[in-house]
Amino acid sequence: GVGFKAGVKDYRLTYYTPEYKTKDTDILAAFRMTPQPGVPAEEAGAAVAAESSTGTWTTVWTDGLTSLDRYKGRCYDIEPVAGEENQYIAYVAYPLDLFEEGSVTNMFTSIVGNVFGFKALRALXXEDLRIPPAYSKTFMGPPHGIQVERDKLNKYGRPLLGCTIKPKLGLSAKNYGRAVYECLRGGLDFTKDDENVNSQPFMRWRDRFLFVAEALFKSQAETGEVKGHYLNATAGTCEEMMKRAIFARELGAPIVMHDYLTGGFTANTSLAFYCRDNGLLLHIHRAMHAVIDRQKDHGMHFRVLAKGLRMSGGDHIHAGTVVGKLEGEREVTLGFVDLLRDDFIQKDRSRGIYFTQDWVSMPGVFPVASGGIHVWHMPALTEIFGDDSVLQFGGGTLGHPWGNAPGAVANRVALEACVQARNEGRDLAREGNEIIREASK
């Protein structure tokens, strides 16, 4: 019989399988590959499949103790990218058994853990993942989701309004609470801790939580509306994070916040479970995302990070603005906004959606538009994001020449005017400025 043959052999002999028919239970990945000069695309694609599943650089004796055909990742298709020299989209199918149930952490460790430093590749970007229902059903997903949140807040038929409290660092807890009160009293639904506000010497978390709670209840009593402030529970350890979330719940706060990329998926999923069990909404900030998703040819596209978050759990997530101070292309942004909100998203390459994604009945996430937007953007934002979104104006509220509360009033008036104009069938794109001008009289 054929004995064990030591040595190094081409990956493509084992891991490039163009005849493979993908299974409904496979996790599928689309990678944008830039091979090193002289490396054939098939070999590069196979190397990606191998290194992110069962392969290693040499044939090993222990391969004989398992069934590689059952467990290996397979590169089943490669297509050149139009308009790019030496760039390909490689499609890889992973058997479900390679992944631990309910662990976004393990999913990313497997798929993007090692292979991005691979010598045969000049660059690699994970463009999209297809998460099969067989896997997504092992996740609880968002603690509450869009519909439940609307019912808890009793707010329907319009986007929600938020505001990040600025200056983000340096305010005392008392002054911070005052700014929160003014914004909520003026008509916002939410105010927000900045992502870098954790527990610093000038404002410890406990003091902030107490003064913010006071602001919440005061503004709630005066306006007759449910109000919230995203209390940032992000901390240096999971235990400390949980302590902060528990304290927020004890104060009667409706929502807490987490920086899910710097905090990590494991911490995030623990927090999401706690929020679900205890009726807290969970606002997610994506600090550090651009480190991973900014380069077109290397890293992970934000739509992949967004899918990971929907599985791990969050009720809101920052998703770019299309119009503000930070990058974002409209169609592509709307693509991952739909991946966050909808049940079923059809494959559409023009929107960056490489696979049809069926979330079955996993709750949706509110996309949050935040960063450099102000009241004149309101018509565009209402049109682009629709009702199921949170629009956040930090400087666009607190920068109002008359102060915080008038800034909040301006945003609420503009939003209500845009929603009404849209419902009356007016064209927001064309008449936007005029609608805002009328409303401000």
Swiss-Prot record:
Active site per UniProt: 166, 285
Gene3D superfamilies the record matches: Ribulose bisphosphate carboxylase, large subunit, C-terminal domain, RuBisCO large subunit, N-terminal domain
Entry's EC annotation: 4.1.1.39
Binding-site residues for Mg(2+), renumbered to this chain: 192, 194-195
Subunit structure: Heterohexadecamer of 8 large chains and 8 small chains; disulfide-linked. The disulfide link is formed within the large subunit homodimers.
Physiological role: RuBisCO catalyzes two reactions: the carboxylation of D-ribulose 1,5-bisphosphate, the primary event in carbon dioxide fixation, as well as the oxidative fragmentation of the pentose substrate in the photorespiration process. Both reactions occur simultaneously and in competition at the same active site.
Record's protein name: Ribulose bisphosphate carboxylase large chain
